Amino acid sequence: MATKRPSADQPSTRPLLDKLGVKPGSKVAIVNLDDPGFIRLLRERTADIITGKPRSKVDLVFLGANTFSQLRKLDDMKKWIEPNGGIWVVRPKGGRSELRDTDLIAAGLTAGLVDNKIASFSDTHGAMRFVYRLRDRPK
């Protein structure tokens, strides 16, 4: 018998870090994201966490964004990630931000990235992941 998949209306029960693709030993950069609870969770999974611009490539970047000017950092940040890495843009849900999903998608495309996943980051914030297209990944 096939297992029943949860409906889109039901929240995921997977742990947040699993949803975000943070694996043990992942290299992570955090920019403009003041969330002590999230950082505590990250430290339980990986010790390789940088605040700000990393000196070497990272697997994941978590960018807190509330404004268009913060989204413009995507073009520079794409140089920070491994070819198969990702940048999560975390922003307030609902009308608490000037940014809409379409704004994030457009900023990603302008930076040469595509969105490929969304996640509920918290009760108040959502996140959208951006990655290189397969054909555009640096060798």
Per-range role (PLM):
Residues 100-119:
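Conserved Class I S-adenosyl-L-methionine
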Residues 113-139:
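Class I S-adenosyl-L-methionine
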Residues 20, 25-34:
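Conserved class I S-adenosyl-L-methionine
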Residues 61-71:
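Short, glycine-rich nucleotide/cofactor-binding loops
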Residues 70-103:
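Mid-chain, well-packed structural core segment of small domains
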Residues 35-41, 96-99:
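Short, charged/polar "capping" segments at the starts of alpha-helices
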Residues 48-58:
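Short acidic low-complexity segments
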Residues 1-19:
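Class I SAM-dependent methyltransferase Rossmann-like catalytic core
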